[in-house]
Swiss-Prot record:
Pfam families: Pantoate_transf. Mg(2+) binds at residues 43, 82, 114. This is 3-methyl-2-oxobutanoate hydroxymethyltransferase. It is found in: Cytoplasm. PANTHER family: 3-METHYL-2-OXOBUTANOATE HYDROXYMETHYLTRANSFERASE. Its main location: cytoplasm. The keyword Cytoplasm applies. Binds 1 Mg(2+) ion per subunit.
Length: 277
């Protein structure tokens, strides 16, 4: 069973941390059996499994539904759950109630919040009441409208300095971990060197403390285009499509089901069912 203590021990021993998204029982079960260190129940589920064009429509009920399923499939893995869009801005009591549900009902080990500024104050307050938080900086999908699309962040001197300072502020606020998304690898390396908490990269190069990728991207399952930073380790699109096509063809041509797929009963019972001959 991984805890923040065991994860920090791995980091301090220079062992890379591996995080993978999972959105349901079977994906979580496979991820745990494969040996990932952390599972992220990301609001990316909105696009990957619910068919939305962004993470914005994802609700708290969506996150709870999927996090419960993931925990049932991965009972011994550290699970981080995203706070969905607009659930942690404004009134803190409302934020606290939402966060509490992810821990109590969703059985999260930590929750992830995107952004800096007021978000870091929220992280600090949640940490003070005993709720472990993960910060998410760089490309933050919930703010993609403000960021003018899915672009690499921190490429200018001013943007890089802001990102570095925000990362340091996230650690000071009490964040237990930082996810850096779509950041130049040189900047990500500098940030990882400055922080004492694990820095998990996605599109942030190799010189951070660990990596996170989306389950469906790693398996090329149900996705058409992969981001530049993704390495697919299988092509389940092809495998699954071929398998389903075979099922369709064999059903239509009468090759399925065969005798080995069927059940039998005593013919005399069948006769009795119809009142005999």
């Amino acid at each position: 069973m991984h805890t923040m203590t065991t994860l920090l021990k791995k980091m301090n021993e220079q062992e890379k941390l591996v995080m993978l998204t999972a959105y349901d029982y079977p994906s979580a079960k496979l991820a745990e059996s494969a040996g990932v260190d952390l599972i992220l129940v990301g609001d990316s589920l909105g696009m990957v499994v619910l068919g939305y064009d962004s993470t914005i429509p994802v609700t708290m009920e969506d996150m709870l539904h999927h996090s419960k399923a993931v925990r049932r499939g991965a009972q011994h893995t550290f699970v981080v759950v995203d706070m969905p869009f607009a659930s942690y801005h404004g009134d803190f009591d409302r934020t606290l109630q939402a966060a509490s549900r992810l821990f109590q009902e969703g059985r999260a080990d930590a929750i992830k919040l995107e952004g800096a500024g007021d978000v870091l104050q929220t992280i600090e307050r949640l940490t003070q009441v005993g709720m472990p938080c993960v910060a998410h900086l760089g490309l933050t999908p919930q703010s993609v409208g403000v960021l003018e699309g899915y672009k690499v962040q921190g490429k200018s001197l001013e943007a890089a300095e802001t990102l570095l300072q925000d990362s340091l502020a996230a650690e000071r606020a009490g964040a237990k971990m930082l996810v850096l998304e779509c950041v130049p690898h040189q900047l990500a390396k500098r940030i990882a060197e400055e922080l004492t908490i694990p820095v998990i990269g996605i599109g942030a190069g190799a010189d951070v403390d660990g990596q996170v990728l989306v389950y469906h991207d790693v398996l090329k399952y149900g996705v058409d285009r992969l981001p530049k930073f993704v390495q697919a380790y299988a092509d389940l699109n092809e495998v699954a499509t071929d398998a389903i096509r075979s099922y369709v063809e064999e059903t239509k041509n009468g090759h399925f089901p065969q005798e080995r797929h069927t059940f039998t009963m005593d013919e005399s019972l069948l006769d009795s069912l119809y009142g005999g001959k």
